[in-house]
Design a protein with these regions (language model features):
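Short, positively charged and aromatic/hydrophobic N-terminal segments
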Residues: 15, 24-28, 32, 53-54
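Absolute protein N-terminus
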Residues: 9, 18, 57-58
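Compositionally biased, low-complexity flexible segments
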Residues: 37-48
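N-terminal, intrinsically disordered, basic low-complexity segments enriched in Arg/Pro/Ser/Thr
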Residues: 2-7, 36
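Short hydrophobic alpha-helical segments enriched in small aliphatic residues
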Residues: 3, 13-16, 20
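RNA pseudouridine synthases
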Residues: 54-246
């Protein structure tokens, strides 16, 4: 439960100690308890105005995580952490990005929303731009799209296509290694799993190591449309990742 933040921990304690009846209402994106839902009292659906003090103002932030930043708030001896870029208290990452990956990261103080964004069972699409070493052909894109056997699991089918980065893509600091004799290819992968280093493992498994990896989208959100440069963040409506989606 520690990954879900204080809201989820408190709701979990209420549930496990049976101090709250089953008469609760999921009022997206969080759970609200009417004061009369304590065990022994009649439970009824609650409107947002009737939430208890367990739930204060919930927040959702989008951050363009810079290269080299570790995905935690605890300080690190040699690397930047999220605390260097995000000054809003009590928010936690909804999913992760490796320190050597860049791009869109969502943070929230609501455990239910955090889970809905991050957990693979909810199948929220995450879009990645990967600059890989070598000239990727159509057959390789088909392999990536059909699912890749990584040894410990086979990835879900996904969308894989060529992409040509525009001037809106920021330069990485430091830049990738450059080899004059070896071309590179930019591809876009749209996946719903987001397991540990999944995109990098997928491209390596089909013979094209990833040199640079940028998460450009989560659900309906796009880092370019948000206008975020590395290290910049913006607060969003709680339903933003799903706005406009079918």
């Amino acid at each position: 439960m520690h990954e879900r933040g204080p809201v989820s921990r408190e709701s979990y304690v209420l549930y496990k100690t049976r101090n709250v009846s089953r008469g609760i209402m999921l009022y997206y994106p969080a759970i609200y308890y009417r004061s009369g839902t304590a065990r022994g009292a009649a439970a009824s659906p609650a409107a947002p105005a009737s939430r208890t003090s367990y739930f204060t103002t919930m927040r959702l932030l989008a951050l363009n995580k810079p290269f080299g930043t570790i995905c935690q708030f605890s300080p690190h001896e040699t690397r930047a952490s999220l605390a260097d870029w995000v000054k809003v208290p009590n928010v936690y990452p909804a999913g992760r990005l490796d320190s050597d990956s860049e791009g869109l990261l969502l943070l929230t103080d609501d455990g239910a929303l955090q889970a809905r964004i991050a957990e693979p069972r909810h199948k929220l699409v995450k879009r990645y731009w990967a600059q890989v070493e070598g000239a990727v052909d159509a057959a390789t894109l088909k392999k990536l799209a059909g699912g890749v056997d990584l040894g410990d699991y086979v990835t879900r089918p996904c969308r894989a296509e060529y992409v040509e980065p525009t001037d809106t893509l920021w330069a990485r600091t430091p830049p990738i290694r450059y080899r004059a004799a070896i071309p590179t290819t930019w591809i876009e992968l749209s996946i719903t799993e987001g397991k540990n280093r999944q995109v990098r493992r997928m491209t390596a498994a089909v013979g094209f190591p990833t040199l640079r990896l940028v998460r450009v989208g989560i659900g309906a959100l796009d880092v370019f449309s948000l206008g975020l440069q590395p290290g910049e963040s913006v607060e969003l409506p709680l339903k933003a990742p799903w706005e406009g989606m079918a």
